[in-house]
């Protein structure tokens, strides 16, 4: 199977180039940022009716930003960043002053933020035109982008299948040539999992290294904003733009940004000599799709052939990660989403003068939230209630500590860990949406990193032999050493060419 949208289906070669290539053309004035941005806007108009990657397209604002870059470059000014002039798709969980921010929920339909998220501001300052806001599972709760109040996104590799979630819109935009760069958020795999299903690259940075200010929260101790693109280098270039300490984010860490771009360039030589790669036993076993395991084993052997030392690693508490995650996350959701009550912003239902404030709040939340969001609010409220807090929430937090300790011990033995990103390739739309447990199981490989606050990357690892659909290799690194992801990821990417 091939992705007809990215290669054969493109009407402009500008939409098939990497972000680094586009930046080189723009900065050398061989092409303008307006031409590149317009090509991608045309591409969105051409194919997004089928893909539905975008919830909002800001053509006027994107072209104005592109014109500003062109004007500065024509005046002899240095580019504002390595990606100045290259357009980008932004997940609709990050607030913007010039476009609606809905988090794909009816309760925020039409909401206009009075301020930009820190990541949004950094993108603007870097001269990166924002093409629009991408579709997602409502409030980032889901693994297929089917939970969006505005319709599902489709996978460019097979329109009957999911692009993953919660950030399927961003990855589908990349895979269909609608954008060369995108921003996602990752609570339990929402960047990495869609990247695996769409043959793109996605990174969850170390918790606290990219600002969450202006991110509509799902679970505050798990959420992390991150970059996604079609190559490791492009992802590194975007990572460097958005990372850094932010005084407006209480969870932001005041540490130097890891040298991710330098690491990606270093790894491009394909040499993995001296790198110890740990294969996590808990993620290499029966129950995963045969084609996914075959691709994973082939990836491990490729890394061995590139000089890496392969070490089997045991992380016993990973088996309990799914249960712990789906207790901690709903508890944080029930707290975070209490603010959406119809009183201050967003939807307000039944406010006809005959109902009390409590009745208006109840009706607003009943009409404004979708089924999965309601399910998690109820679960979280129950787990936090008197008599159950110690038995459920505190126990889950203890398991979280044990998982972090497993990672610490593992990284004493190896430089990075690897696993499949997902247990299977993309499933058909509708297959899991009525079975929450099946949907939750799709996050098995990715969510332990979020519980521990560490960094991870998914990058293409070949097509599955049984479905012909993309698979992803997940690389995991210690906290604040995100550059290891890029060094190893770029080398692996080079070895596949």
Swiss-Prot record:
Protein name per UniProt: Glutamyl-tRNA(Gln) amidotransferase subunit A
Active site: 91 (charge relay system), 166 (charge relay system), 190 (acyl-ester intermediate)
SUPFAM superfamilies: Amidase signature (AS) enzymes (SSF75304)
HAMAP family in UniProt: GatA (MF_00120)
UniProt-annotated stretches for the region Disordered: 150-173
Pfam families: Amidase (PF01425)
Protein EC: 6.3.5.7
NCBIfam families, A to Z: gatA
GO BP: any one term: translation
Lineage per the UniProt record: Bacteria, Bacillati, Actinomycetota, Actinomycetes, Mycobacteriales
Entry superkingdom: Bacteria
Family that this chain belongs to: Belongs to the amidase family. GatA subfamily.
Originating organism: Corynebacterium efficiens (strain DSM 44549 / YS-314 / AJ 12310 / JCM 11189 / NBRC 100395)
The entry's keywords: ATP-binding, Ligase, Nucleotide-binding, Protein biosynthesis
Molecular function GO labels: ATP binding; glutaminyl-tRNA synthase (glutamine-hydrolyzing) activity
GO cellular component: glutamyl-tRNA(Gln) amidotransferase complex
